[in-house]
Amino acid sequence: SGRGVRIKTDSPFVTHCKSKQGELLACELPGREARRTEPRFTNLPTAAEALFKVIAPLLLEDTETPYVLIGHSVGSWLLFELLKLIVSGGVPEPAQLVISSFPAPSLPTSERPWRAQRQLGEAAFKDECRRWDSNELIFQDSLWEHYGPLMRDDFTLFDEYVYEPPQAPFKMPIQAYVAQRDQKVTEKHLRNWAGLTSAHFSLESVPGHHLFFYDYPVRNEWMDNVIAALPENCR
């Protein structure tokens, strides 16, 4: 979760799942791609509840097969909220949580490395988007009419987010990744995820900027790394 990336050729994730007779389930939030006409979420817990309603029956149907949750950018916070619902709902927990390019949700609001979009005029908001390494094409007038409101809503997801800690630290290991040229999120921000689990925490770096998913060689290198770091029962 976190990016609406459409992959037209087999990625390392797809190849790995095929070789293990596993499944790869991608989350596409309302307001994007095939769901672009649906109202967008502006509240992460609400989005997590909607995702939980979809995924919980699948996990309860097969309680023996291990699974991993993977989230990029604000998708990491979406998975944090989803995990709280999984734990409290008695649903089988993931064998591992993989997150990239976003601070731990426990980071105090005053230390978040961005400016709240509601305080920004259009020019300042575009500048903020550029600092997240957004593609310059979206700032063309004909495209900004669509992407401007979409990104305002996306920013609201993390601007207005209020952290509520889980009842206890999670029990699964957390594998984290920081992009080497990310203008916003640093290694220090990622290390704070360690406090959310009682299990092992690992942090590695990947080449590229915040949206390294759009650099296919880097994305595939990252995917290979994720696969190599999977728990034994998921390899």
Question: For the regions a protein language model found, what residue spans apply to each?
Answer:
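Gly/Ala-rich beta-loop-alpha elbow adjacent to hydrolase catalytic centers
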Residues: 71-75, 79
